[in-house]
Protein backbone atom coordinates (compact mmCIF):
# COMPACT_ATOMS: atom_id res chain seq x y z
CA UNK A 1 0.00 0.00 0.00
CA UNK A 2 1.40 3.38 -1.03
CA UNK A 3 0.90 6.23 1.47
CA UNK A 4 0.64 9.53 -0.32
CA UNK A 5 1.84 12.87 1.10
CA UNK A 6 -1.46 14.06 2.56
CA UNK A 7 -2.16 10.69 4.08
CA UNK A 8 1.29 10.66 5.65
CA UNK A 9 0.73 14.07 7.23
CA UNK A 10 -2.65 12.98 8.60
CA UNK A 11 -1.13 9.80 10.00
CA UNK A 12 1.69 11.68 11.68
CA UNK A 13 -0.78 14.14 13.21
CA UNK A 14 -2.89 11.24 14.48
CA UNK A 15 0.16 9.76 16.19
CA UNK A 16 1.84 12.93 17.44
CA UNK A 17 -1.11 15.19 18.39
CA UNK A 18 -2.46 13.12 21.34
CA UNK A 19 1.05 12.96 22.75
CA UNK A 20 1.39 16.75 22.46
CA UNK A 21 -2.03 17.32 24.03
CA UNK A 22 -1.20 14.96 26.89
CA UNK A 23 2.13 16.69 27.47
CA UNK A 24 0.43 20.12 27.38
CA UNK A 25 -2.26 18.88 29.76
CA UNK A 26 0.36 17.65 32.21
CA UNK A 27 2.20 20.98 32.01
CA UNK A 28 -1.10 22.81 32.62
CA UNK A 29 -1.85 20.60 35.62
CA UNK A 30 1.61 21.25 37.04
CA UNK A 31 1.14 25.00 36.54
CA UNK A 32 -2.24 24.86 38.24
CA UNK A 33 -0.79 22.95 41.18
CA UNK A 34 1.78 25.71 41.53
CA UNK A 35 -1.00 28.33 41.40
CA UNK A 36 -2.90 26.53 44.14
CA UNK A 37 0.22 26.26 46.29
CA UNK A 38 0.82 30.00 45.87
CA UNK A 39 -2.82 30.80 46.67
CA UNK A 40 -2.68 28.78 49.89
CA UNK A 41 0.68 30.28 50.82
CA UNK A 42 -0.63 33.83 50.37
CA UNK A 43 -3.82 32.95 52.26
CA UNK A 44 -1.91 31.55 55.23
CA UNK A 45 0.28 34.64 55.17
CA UNK A 46 -2.88 36.81 55.38
CA UNK A 47 -2.17 38.31 51.95
CA UNK A 48 -5.81 37.88 51.03
CA UNK A 49 -5.96 40.03 47.90
CA UNK A 50 -3.03 38.20 46.30
CA UNK A 51 -4.48 34.83 47.30
CA UNK A 52 -7.83 35.77 45.80
CA UNK A 53 -6.29 36.47 42.39
CA UNK A 54 -4.97 32.90 42.21
CA UNK A 55 -8.14 31.33 43.64
CA UNK A 56 -10.30 33.15 41.09
CA UNK A 57 -8.02 32.03 38.27
CA UNK A 58 -8.32 28.42 39.39
CA UNK A 59 -12.06 28.75 39.97
CA UNK A 60 -12.52 29.76 36.33
CA UNK A 61 -10.95 26.45 35.24
CA UNK A 62 -12.01 23.96 37.91
CA UNK A 63 -14.84 23.38 40.35
CA UNK A 64 -13.07 24.20 43.60
CA UNK A 65 -13.89 22.15 46.68
CA UNK A 66 -15.88 23.76 49.56
CA UNK A 67 -12.80 24.61 51.63
CA UNK A 68 -11.12 26.58 48.85
CA UNK A 69 -14.40 28.35 48.09
CA UNK A 70 -14.64 29.23 51.78
CA UNK A 71 -11.08 30.59 51.57
CA UNK A 72 -12.23 32.74 48.65
CA UNK A 73 -15.07 34.09 50.79
CA UNK A 74 -12.59 35.07 53.50
CA UNK A 75 -10.52 36.87 50.86
CA UNK A 76 -13.60 38.72 49.57
CA UNK A 77 -14.43 39.74 53.15
CA UNK A 78 -10.96 41.18 53.76
CA UNK A 79 -11.25 42.99 50.42
CA UNK A 80 -14.48 44.57 51.75
CA UNK A 81 -16.42 42.90 48.96
CA UNK A 82 -19.33 41.97 51.24
CA UNK A 83 -21.70 41.15 48.39
CA UNK A 84 -19.43 38.44 46.98
CA UNK A 85 -18.74 37.16 50.49
CA UNK A 86 -22.44 36.50 51.07
CA UNK A 87 -23.00 35.18 47.54
CA UNK A 88 -20.26 32.61 48.17
CA UNK A 89 -21.15 31.58 51.71
CA UNK A 90 -24.96 31.66 51.64
CA UNK A 91 -25.02 28.53 49.48
CA UNK A 92 -21.90 27.00 51.03
CA UNK A 93 -22.36 27.07 54.81
CA UNK A 94 -24.45 23.89 54.98
CA UNK A 95 -21.65 21.93 53.29
CA UNK A 96 -19.06 23.12 55.82
CA UNK A 97 -20.51 21.26 58.81
CA UNK A 98 -17.77 18.61 58.55
CA UNK A 99 -15.15 21.23 59.40
CA UNK A 100 -13.92 21.92 62.94
CA UNK A 101 -16.28 24.12 65.00
CA UNK A 102 -13.73 26.95 65.22
CA UNK A 103 -13.33 27.02 61.44
CA UNK A 104 -17.10 26.98 60.93
CA UNK A 105 -17.42 29.85 63.42
CA UNK A 106 -15.13 32.00 61.24
CA UNK A 107 -17.29 31.46 58.16
CA UNK A 108 -20.55 32.11 60.03
CA UNK A 109 -19.08 35.30 61.48
CA UNK A 110 -17.77 36.79 58.23
CA UNK A 111 -21.04 35.97 56.46
CA UNK A 112 -23.06 37.53 59.29
CA UNK A 113 -20.84 40.61 59.38
CA UNK A 114 -21.07 40.95 55.58
CA UNK A 115 -24.87 40.79 55.69
CA UNK A 116 -24.77 43.36 58.51
CA UNK A 117 -22.65 45.71 56.39
CA UNK A 118 -25.14 45.21 53.54
CA UNK A 119 -27.93 46.19 56.01
CA UNK A 120 -29.55 42.78 55.67
CA UNK A 121 -30.09 42.51 59.41
CA UNK A 122 -32.45 39.52 59.37
CA UNK A 123 -29.94 37.24 57.63
CA UNK A 124 -27.08 38.71 59.66
CA UNK A 125 -28.95 37.83 62.85
CA UNK A 126 -29.49 34.25 61.66
CA UNK A 127 -25.79 33.75 60.93
CA UNK A 128 -24.62 35.42 64.14
CA UNK A 129 -26.90 33.13 66.15
CA UNK A 130 -25.81 30.03 64.20
CA UNK A 131 -22.15 30.80 64.76
CA UNK A 132 -22.48 31.79 68.43
CA UNK A 133 -22.33 28.27 69.98
CA UNK A 134 -19.34 27.42 67.77
CA UNK A 135 -17.37 30.51 68.81
CA UNK A 136 -14.77 30.93 71.51
CA UNK A 137 -16.05 32.55 74.72
CA UNK A 138 -13.72 35.50 74.12
CA UNK A 139 -15.52 36.28 70.87
CA UNK A 140 -19.07 36.09 72.20
CA UNK A 141 -19.14 39.59 73.70
CA UNK A 142 -18.77 41.19 70.29
CA UNK A 143 -21.23 38.77 68.67
CA UNK A 144 -23.88 39.62 71.28
CA UNK A 145 -23.13 43.30 70.60
CA UNK A 146 -23.85 42.78 66.90
CA UNK A 147 -26.96 40.71 67.67
CA UNK A 148 -28.18 43.60 69.79
CA UNK A 149 -27.92 45.97 66.84
CA UNK A 150 -29.70 43.52 64.52
CA UNK A 151 -32.66 43.50 66.92
CA UNK A 152 -32.38 47.26 67.41
CA UNK A 153 -32.64 47.98 63.69
CA UNK A 154 -35.66 45.67 63.56
CA UNK A 155 -37.19 47.64 66.48
CA UNK A 156 -37.22 44.55 68.71
CA UNK A 157 -36.39 46.50 71.83
CA UNK A 158 -36.57 43.75 74.47
CA UNK A 159 -34.47 41.33 72.42
CA UNK A 160 -31.97 44.11 71.70
CA UNK A 161 -31.79 44.96 75.41
CA UNK A 162 -31.17 41.30 76.31
CA UNK A 163 -28.36 40.99 73.75
CA UNK A 164 -26.62 44.21 74.84
CA UNK A 165 -26.75 43.10 78.48
CA UNK A 166 -25.30 39.69 77.51
CA UNK A 167 -22.52 41.49 75.64
CA UNK A 168 -21.52 43.46 78.73
CA UNK A 169 -21.69 40.30 80.86
CA UNK A 170 -19.59 38.27 78.42
CA UNK A 171 -16.82 40.87 78.34
CA UNK A 172 -16.84 41.09 82.15
CA UNK A 173 -16.92 37.31 82.68
CA UNK A 174 -13.89 36.86 80.43
CA UNK A 175 -12.01 39.89 81.84
CA UNK A 176 -11.68 41.39 78.38
CA UNK A 177 -11.33 45.06 77.47
CA UNK A 178 -14.54 46.31 75.91
CA UNK A 179 -14.02 49.21 73.52
CA UNK A 180 -17.76 49.22 72.83
CA UNK A 181 -18.79 49.44 76.48
CA UNK A 182 -19.96 53.06 76.52
CA UNK A 183 -21.93 52.68 73.31
CA UNK A 184 -23.46 49.45 74.60
CA UNK A 185 -24.54 51.17 77.82
CA UNK A 186 -26.08 53.97 75.76
CA UNK A 187 -27.98 51.39 73.70
CA UNK A 188 -29.23 49.72 76.88
CA UNK A 189 -30.59 53.03 78.14
CA UNK A 190 -32.20 53.69 74.77
CA UNK A 191 -33.93 50.29 74.76
CA UNK A 192 -35.14 50.77 78.32
CA UNK A 193 -36.60 54.11 77.31
CA UNK A 194 -38.43 52.50 74.39
CA UNK A 195 -39.84 49.83 76.71
CA UNK A 196 -41.30 52.28 79.23
CA UNK A 197 -45.11 52.06 79.29
CA UNK A 198 -46.80 55.09 77.79
CA UNK A 199 -49.48 56.77 79.95
CA UNK A 200 -52.74 57.42 78.11
CA UNK A 201 -54.26 60.83 78.73
CA UNK A 202 -58.04 60.59 79.25
CA UNK A 203 -60.41 63.59 79.39
CA UNK A 204 -60.82 63.10 83.15
CA UNK A 205 -57.10 63.53 83.70
CA UNK A 206 -56.76 66.66 81.57
CA UNK A 207 -56.04 69.79 83.62
CA UNK A 208 -59.10 72.00 84.04
CA UNK A 209 -58.83 75.62 82.93
CA UNK A 210 -59.87 77.86 85.87
CA UNK A 211 -62.86 80.08 85.13
CA UNK A 212 -62.36 83.82 85.11
CA UNK A 213 -64.12 86.05 87.63
CA UNK A 214 -66.30 87.49 84.84
CA UNK A 215 -67.57 84.09 83.77
CA UNK A 216 -68.27 83.16 87.40
CA UNK A 217 -70.37 86.33 87.83
CA UNK A 218 -72.22 85.69 84.57
CA UNK A 219 -73.08 82.16 85.69
CA UNK A 220 -74.31 83.48 89.06
CA UNK A 221 -76.58 86.06 87.35
CA UNK A 222 -78.06 83.36 85.12
CA UNK A 223 -78.87 81.16 88.09
CA UNK A 224 -80.57 84.09 89.92
CA UNK A 225 -82.78 84.83 86.89
CA UNK A 226 -83.88 81.18 86.78
CA UNK A 227 -84.91 81.31 90.45
CA UNK A 228 -87.09 84.42 89.82
Task: Show which residues each predicted segment covers.
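Alpha-helical segment of the N-proximal tetratricopeptide repeat
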Residues: 30-57, 61
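Terminal, low-structured helical/coil segments at or just beyond the last alpha-helical repeat
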Residues: 161, 166-228
Amino acid sequence: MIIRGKQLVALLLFIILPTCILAQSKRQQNNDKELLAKAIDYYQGTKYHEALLFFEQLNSIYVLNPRFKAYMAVCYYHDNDFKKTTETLDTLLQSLTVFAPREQAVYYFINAESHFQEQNYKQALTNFEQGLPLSDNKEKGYIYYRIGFCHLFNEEWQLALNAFELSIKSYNDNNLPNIHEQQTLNMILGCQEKLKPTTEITPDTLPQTPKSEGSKQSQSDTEEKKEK
